[in-house]
Amino acid sequence: MIRILLVDNYDSFTYNLYQYMGEVMEESGKPFRIDVVRNDEKSYEDLNSASYDRVVISPGPGNPSDPKYFGVCTKILQNPAPTQKVLGVCLGMQGMAHVYGGKVVRAALPMHGKTSPIEHDGKGVFAGLPQGIEVMRYHSLIAEEQSLPA
């Protein structure tokens, strides 16, 4: 069974992610379980002992450098299990940039409810998606590209 942890950073989109993840896993035919846990509900030690195969860190308000907004997510990113796959969405991705040495800064142009086409390699979460697919953006912060580790 694939065990998935969805960390809720107090964002209304978390349960959209839960639903989409459930649909994808159902289609895969693999047995799975998705646990939704708020970022301040359990300790890192409790979550780590549950041995999740996958972790998804949700969107949320605030900056990932502030523990009141990012909670246990920092420790999860600092100490992933060797075979654990982690996906960050919005605040979750910004948190990944922050934890691994990048800078999270205010965007010159906030993108709230705007769409943009994306280019991708067709692998992983992009498998089966067409080039130039329009995606919705909701963010005021960005990971500063030149600060990201190579």
Region spans (language model):
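Conserved G/P- and acidic residue-centered "switch" motifs that form tight phosphate/ATP-binding loops
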Residues: 8, 90
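Flexible gly/pro-rich beta->alpha loop and the following alpha-helix that scaffold active-site loops
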Residues: 3, 12-88
